[in-house]
Amino acid sequence: MAKEKFERSKPHVNVGTIGHVDHGKTTLTAAITKVMAEKNGGMARKFDEIDSAPEEKARGITINTSHVEYESPNRHYAHVDCPGHADYVKNMITGAAQMDGAILVCSAADGPMPQTREHILLSRQVGVPKIVVFLNKCDMVDDEELLELVEMEVRELLDQYEFPGDDTPVIMGSALRAIEGDEAYVEKIVELVQAMDDYIPAPERDTEKPFILPIEDVFSISGRGTVVTGRIERGVVNIGDEVEVVGIRPTQKTTVTGVEMFRKLLDRGEAGDNVGILVRGLKRDDVERGQVLCKPGSIKPHTKFEAEVYVLSKEEGGRHTPFFKGYRPQFYFRTTDITGAVELPEGVEMVMPGDNVKMTITLINPIAMDEGLRFAIREGGRTVGAGVVAKIIE
């Protein structure tokens, strides 16, 4: 008898607030929790509770993030808000808080500012699928034309980074007035959440994606063959499935002849399971840690890609000195380190600890990768940076 499946009545969607400092991200977060709690049940969270974000560690990097939850009529939202700009950069690059969509907060009184642009760019680089816009502090702008101008600027900025500016929902409101209970502005929060329900797609569940298992270990079991072990990253695998071994060496095909978990035999394994998979016709030496087992054709090995990278500061245990072009650290993908060479963008001579930078990386061996894959940069086993694959080149 299978375990009872955990039933969620509403789909679960992860979102976050992004935008320039002091444009009202945290106030909006507080306003949404208050209005949704009144309409749909749940807990209202005050500005101060959200603002004093606890420290978390993601891949050895310290990030301050606040997590709140609320219900819309159709969905359950988990929402992240960060106090400082650096926290956003780290959060998005490490994927510590996965975002199915983002709420871009822009003050109508100030219009788009440098971090507005940077957060849109980061969203593009790390693969945030959709953005909805909340023009905040509209109560401070009397001029209708000025509001339209700011809206136009934001839409153009979205277009620049390949988000559909014209189709993006833009809600005009005031988070503070909504918290104070001003009905007209409370209505704008309801409108915003409705726009999120309609415009941000519900994420595909991990079990519905193509199967992939990063290989951690390989054993040979006499009389039975070769077993690879690891945790299934996504998808489902059944006995009899054809799979490929991808990365480091030329791709090989094989068939799954057994799946076991805690020494019990199963018919199938799914995302999140730690399993041993028996593969037909492969010797122990044909497979190694760092490769992946996957659905045939679903993922290809690559060596050259563009990445968005955050370099740890000295305080975070990173490098004490900058690095220059020709830097050759190890790149840790899933279960293994691969050496690679770094090319910096034109006009960038060096990268300081604490910076974030776009770079092109060429690995000495191919690794199974998709855009959006996260990695760590290491020197002799010590993490000195975190990155995400933004664009595959070859």
Swiss-Prot record:
- Occurrences of domain tr-type G (ranges): 10-204
Q: Where does Mg(2+) bind?
A: T26
Q: Looking at the record, which segments are called G5?
A: 174-176
Q: Which GO terms describe its molecular function?
A: GTP binding; GTPase activity; guanosine tetraphosphate binding; translation elongation factor activity
Looking up CDD domains in the UniProt record yields: EF_Tu, EFTU_II, EFTU_III
According to the record, the residues making up region (G1) are 19-26
GO cellular component terms? cytosol
**E.C. number, please?**
3.6.5.3
Query: Where is the protein situated, by its record's location annotation?
Result: Cytoplasm
Does the record bear Glycoprotein in its keywords?
no
**Binding site residues for GTP:** 19-26, 81-85, 136-139
Region entry G3: which residue ranges? 81-84
Residue span of region G2: 60-64
What's this protein's function? GTP hydrolase that promotes the GTP-dependent binding of aminoacyl-tRNA to the A-site of ribosomes during protein biosynthesis.
Subunit composition? Answer: Monomer.
Q: Which NCBIfam families match?
A: EF-Tu (TIGR00485), PRK00049.1 (NF000766), PRK12735.1 (NF009372), PRK12736.1 (NF009373), small_GTP (TIGR00231)
Which protein family is it in? Answer: Belongs to the TRAFAC class translation factor GTPase superfamily. Classic translation factor GTPase family. EF-Tu/EF-1A subfamily.
Q: What is the protein's name according to its record? A: Elongation factor Tu
Origin species: Francisella tularensis subsp. tularensis (strain SCHU S4 / Schu 4)
Gene of this entry = tuf
